[in-house]
C-alpha cells in the first residue's frame, strides 16, 4: 500500500493508475497509512509571494516537516515529488538523480528538499 499525500493533478493521476495499491491521506492527517509514501503536496505556482507571503512556506515546508516528524521512529520509503523549478536557470532537462539544483526564487527554494 502507498500513502499518497497531495491528490492534486499529479497525485490524482497516480491514484487512478494505481488505485488498488494507493490510499489518499486526508489533508489534515500527518501520520502515514503505510510504510511507503508518495508526497506530492505543493503550491501550484511561484507567485504567492506577492499576495500570500507565507503560503509557500506553510504548504511546502510546514506540512512536509510535520509528516517527516511522524516518520522519524520507523523505516519508511519516502518519495518526494518536486518540480523543475529547483533546477533553476540553465538547468538541463530531463534532469537526473545527480543533476545540480540551483533554485532561483522563493517557491523553488521551498521545493528543494
Label each PLM-derived region with a short phrase.
Residues 4-5, 40, 81:
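Short hydrophobic segments within beta-strands
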Residues 29-62, 70, 86:
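NAD(P)H-binding glycine-rich loop region in Rossmannoid oxidoreductase-like domains
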Residues 20-30:
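NAD(P)-binding Rossmann-fold cofactor-contacting core
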Residues 66-104:
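Conserved Rossmann-fold NAD(P)-dependent oxidoreductase catalytic core, especially the SDR/UDP-sugar
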Residues 18-19, 51-54, 92-96:
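Short, glycine/charged-enriched secondary-structure capping and boundary segments
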Residues 1-20:
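N-terminal Rossmann NAD(P)H-binding glycine-rich loop of SDR-like oxidoreductase domains
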Residues 13-15, 48-50, 88-91:
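Short glycine-/acidic-enriched loop or helix-start segments at secondary-structure transitions
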Residues 102-113:
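Active-site Tyr-X1-5-Lys
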